C-alpha cells in the first residue's frame, strides 16, 4: 500500500513525540508549518501548558512586506518566540519539528531561535 505525504508526516510526528517531551526545566519548542503560515510554541508537557507562542498571524509579522509563508517570516517567528521565552526565563528547549522535514521554513525557525539565545 502506497503511503501518501499526509500519512508519512503523521507517522514521523508520532515517532518524534514518543521520544521528545517537554519538562518545566526544558520545555518543547513545537513548530507547525501550514501552506500560508508558521506557528511556534514553547510547551511544558508535564503540566500541559503553552508557555510562549508566536506565529505569522500576529499583527507585527503579518504586516511585513514579505509574505507569511517565506523563510524570512519564519526567521522572524523564531526570533520572536526566543525573545518571549527568554523574558519568561526559559533558556533551553527541545526542538519538535512536528513531523516536517528539517529544511526550509522549519530550519529557519530553529536557526533564528538559536541565534536569539535558545539552547537546543
From Swiss-Prot:
Protein name: Large ribosomal subunit protein uL18
Source taxon at top rank: Bacteria
An example molecular function term from Gene Ontology annotations: structural constituent of ribosome
Entry keyword ATP-binding: no
Lineage: Bacteria, Bacillati, Cyanobacteriota, Cyanophyceae, Gloeobacterales
Pfam families: Ribosomal_L18p
InterPro entries per record: Ribosomal_uL18_bac-type, Ribosomal_uL18_bac/euk
Annotated Gene Ontology cellular component terms: cytosolic large ribosomal subunit
Keyword hit for Transcription: no
Coiled-coil ranges from the UniProt annotation: none
Biased composition (Basic residues): 8-20
General function of this protein: This is one of the proteins that bind and probably mediate the attachment of the 5S RNA into the large ribosomal subunit, where it forms part of the central protuberance.
